Amino acid sequence: MTQLLVTTTENIPGHPYEVIGEVFGLTTQSKNLVRNIGAGLKGLVGGEIKDYTKMLEESRDVAVNRLRDNASAMGADAVVMMRFDTGSISQDMQSVAAYGTAVRFITEDLTTDNA
């Protein structure tokens, strides 16, 4: 089985489609206390907080996978105009939403009636 196509563009060359509707995938992640202390110390001296960067990357992956699952359940062939939205719930919790438009490919009838 092929993986459902997710794109940030509005058009998919060679694939006309009909809109099914909006679709999204959500996740909220947090790091453990020990890592939060380490991140707090890193925040004092500056620089990238790699644990939080990794958490956000993992959160985006989870959100996109849930987006794909939800679109598939709607009967979609693809999701167009996919975007991310992120927000902090607390100092150590981050939510990520992946959202877009679920679409179904239109198969054009190429047969002609010469009768």
Curated annotation (Swiss-Prot):
InterPro entries: UPF0145_dom_sf, UPF0145_YbjQ-like. SUPFAM superfamilies: YbjQ-like (SSF117782). Pfam families: YbjQ_1. Belongs to the UPF0145 family. This is UPF0145 protein lp_2083. It comes from the Bacteria. Gene3D superfamilies: Hypothetical protein apc22750. Chain B (3.30.110.70). It comes from Lactiplantibacillus plantarum (strain ATCC BAA-793 / NCIMB 8826 / WCFS1).
